[in-house]
């Protein structure tokens, strides 16, 4: 193996890999040290952040792949924040101070692995289960949809319904002849698969394409958008039925915007990065029940409806 050394600025390896589905292909060996254990170049790529440098130990001569998976291809947080103004700029700057150095780690060359990881993440603990499942799926079947679709069961890995559902979804996925380069078309094609809704399709595309404007809408994004006053409480999550029946413009004209369209409007060009920030925030501090308001940024508390209500400030 040889070593590559990158000078880094506004970058945090843990905050970049942890919220990305690319992390399902990695194992954290120690603080700020991740080793690839599944996918292309498994056991041949290792990232280690040491102060202001990212060291990459690898046999991979594809520098582009390394930049994608490390997240170093992505724009600096301050560059994105500079495009905002007013209260939104204040809030996103505060979020970025709580979770500094967040970039988007993507893997365009690992579509099958990422798609499988996203499917398995439905209503389960990602850190506890999905990581373990992905390691076993790679070791047994190299994330090959053709092999997985033919399995009668997957009990040697686990009995959770997510694993059973994976076989059904892979059967539909194999019927796809071509996945369009156009994100909206690709999204619709993926949603033709059993068990794949807007969130799964969008998350798969966000982490396999250079498209930071794609917005997977989860409960964290919805909750934080409401609490910070970005959206009205009536704004709905994207619905598979509507997403397949209508193109976005037509759906908005008939039923009004969904959360995805509102986030795209508020944060043009980088809604996926915003979703990543809110995932980190919602998973650790701004929880649905018993949020840890004392750990929150003072600026965010000023704007938060939940904090104001709990403290009789409004």
Which residues fall in each region the model found?
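HhH-family (HhH-GPD) DNA N-glycosylase catalytic core used in base-excision repair
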Residues: 1-314
């Amino acid at each position: 193996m040889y070593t590559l050394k990158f000078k880094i600025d506004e970058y945090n390896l843990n905050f970049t890999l942890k919220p990305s589905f690319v992390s399902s292909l990695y194992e954290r060996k120690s603080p700020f040290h991740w080793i690839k254990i599944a996918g292309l170049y498994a056991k041949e790529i290792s990232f280690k952040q040491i102060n202001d440098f990212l060291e990459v130990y690898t046999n991979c001569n594809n520098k582009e792949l390394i930049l994608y998976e490390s997240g170093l291809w992505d724009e600096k947080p301050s560059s994105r924040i500079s495009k905002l103004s007013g209260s939104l700029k204040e809030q996103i700057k505060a979020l970025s101070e709580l979770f500094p150095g967040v970039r988007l780690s993507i893997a365009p060359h690992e579509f099958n692995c990422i798609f499988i990881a996203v499917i398995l993440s439905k209503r389960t603990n990602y850190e506890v289960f999905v990581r373990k499942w992905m390691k076993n799926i790679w070791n047994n079947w190299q994330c090959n949809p053709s092999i997985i679709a033919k399995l009668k069961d997957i009990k040697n890995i686990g009995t959770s319904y997510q694993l059973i559902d994976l076989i059904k979804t892979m059967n539909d996925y194999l019927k796809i002849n071509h996945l369009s380069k156009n994100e909206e078309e690709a999204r619709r094609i993926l949603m033709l698969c059993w068990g794949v809704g807007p969130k799964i399709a969008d998350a798969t595309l966000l982490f396999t394409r250079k498209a930071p404007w794609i917005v997977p809408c989860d409960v964290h994004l919805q909750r934080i958008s409401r609490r910070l006053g970005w959206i009205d409480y009536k704004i709905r999550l994207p619905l598979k039925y509507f997403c397949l029946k209508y193109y976005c413009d037509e759906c908005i004209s008939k039923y009004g915007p969904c959360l995805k369209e509102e986030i795209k409007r508020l944060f043009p060009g980088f809604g996926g990065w915003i979703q990543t920030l809110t995932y980190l925030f919602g998973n650790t501090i701004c929880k649905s029940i018993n949020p840890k308001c004392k750990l929150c940024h003072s600026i965010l508390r000023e704007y938060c409806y939940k904090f104001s209500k709990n403290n009789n400030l409004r």
